[in-house]
């Protein structure tokens, strides 16, 4: 459980878990800045991240990065992603589920949620604002992907929803 504010820079990792059935609870604000910097990283199947705190990602960093099948991310806080190669939530694996309930702002070439795998679902119920060339709200690369957009989506400036 991460309760306080965390700042991760210069290629560092805030929380890293290797193994199946891992859960990370982030209740405090997480700031990730810089290439190869990661807020929370899980390597294993059935990984789960509960992001109740705010997530601020820039400079090519990754907020949440899970490698493994059947991963789940519940994002309830405010997510801000700025700059090319910056990704708020990335999952590499099949049967991933991402629930974005908080407000998300994606700008300057950043990506809010990226899932690389088959049978993935992204449930977007919070407000999402995407602004700027090459900025992307939600991207699924794989077969049988499903994006459910129940929240407001505002796309401008050459961005992609």
Predicted segments with their positions:
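Beta-strand-rich solenoid/repeat architectures in extracellular/passenger domains
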Residues: 1-11, 21-23, 28-36, 49-60, ...
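Extracellular, beta-strand-rich repeat scaffolds characterized by small/acidic residue-biased motifs
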Residues: 19, 44-46, 59, 68, ...
